[in-house]
């Protein structure tokens, strides 16, 4: 086992093998950069026609997300497919956790047949909601999905 000391802002071993340590650091940095770019490839947030989505252009899927600048309101019809900024058609397959949570001005929503799951607290506190069209394709309802809607 080697002893390391800190000198002149460089970590160097007592036997003077500074280059092996630098090589190790470079290897770790390269591995982290490769892993992070592979994970992020094709996955991005976009606002399309007033809806915020998490798009996976590789899988050609989209999840409707909560808005970051206010709430959804009125009568809403969610499209079955959306086109990403780079031209990829993505099927809307899910509503994320809290997608419409707290949207008291939301009165009705039509969910497309491409959607298979509604996340936790998806419509929580949507007190103005009077009509929801849920297709048979939806097989998963998150916990508290319609909590405090009446």
Predicted regions and their residues:
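N-terminal secretory signal peptides that target proteins for export/translocation
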Residues: 1-19
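Structural signature of tandem-repeat unit edges
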Residues: 57-58, 71-94, 103-117, 127-140, ...
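Bacterial N-terminal signal peptides
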Residues: 16, 23-35
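Boundary at the C-terminal end of the N-terminal hydrophobic targeting segment
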Residues: 38-45
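Consensus positions within tandem repeat domains that build extended binding/scaffold surfaces
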Residues: 97-99, 119-122, 142-147
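Short, ordered beta-strand-loop transition motifs
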Residues: 47-61
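Non-globular, low-complexity intrinsically disordered regions
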Residues: 63-65
